[in-house]
């Protein structure tokens, strides 16, 4: 259940379609996590969070590959960047809350996270634990610059995105 929500979000129409598709694949038996991972539709937010986790784990090559896939699927670079920014802001919020001895429930309430926030913020907390506050601030600066460059530069957006992923990897290690 959590894997499907993680990949599809809370869109009831999308969830119903995914469950129908996966149920047919399983012969109307048990739907496994492997089936969800292999064939489940993914939202941009889920894909970009996967990219963040890959970068945080030092697997930049795989993050670059996921970026190439997102771009090949005609996702707009500015939308990918916005989703990345959202994911890094989530990590910053969770990290600051932890430093202030506040719970994930407090974060969810304070920032209006709805639905299955406990799973989402729990995953965010695990990823954020690899960072110090200054590293996340540097990552947000990298993404702010990327956003500005995508909106104003004549340079190739794909190259700007690839460069930013490398800079995020470096910022997360400094």
Predicted regions mapped to residue ranges:
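Long, charge-dense, solvent-exposed interaction surfaces that engage phosphate-rich ligands
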Residues: 1-49, 54-57
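Helix-rich C-terminal "collar"/helical-bundle subdomain used as an assembly and partner-interaction module
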Residues: 59-174
């Amino acid at each position: 259940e959590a894997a499907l929500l993680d990949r599809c979000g809370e869109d009831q129409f999308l969830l119903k379609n995914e469950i129908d598709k996966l149920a047919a694949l399983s012969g109307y038996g048990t739907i496994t996590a492997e089936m969800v991972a292999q064939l489940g539709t993914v939202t941009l937010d889920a894909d970009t969070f996967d990219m963040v986790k890959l970068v945080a784990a030092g697997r930049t090559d795989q993050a670059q590959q996921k970026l190439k896939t997102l771009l090949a699927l005609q996702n707009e670079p500015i939308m990918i960047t916005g989703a990345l920014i959202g994911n890094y802001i989530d990590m910053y919020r969770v990290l600051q809350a932890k430093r202030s001895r506040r719970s994930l429930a407090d974060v969810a309430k304070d920032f209006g996270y709805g639905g299955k926030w406990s799973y989402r913020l729990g995953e965010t907390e695990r990823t954020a634990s690899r960072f110090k506050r200054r590293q996340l601030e540097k990552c947000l600066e990298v993404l702010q610059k990327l956003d500005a460059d995508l909106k104003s530069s004549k340079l190739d957006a794909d190259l700007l995105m690839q460069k930013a992923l490398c800079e995020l990897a470096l910022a997360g290690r400094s």
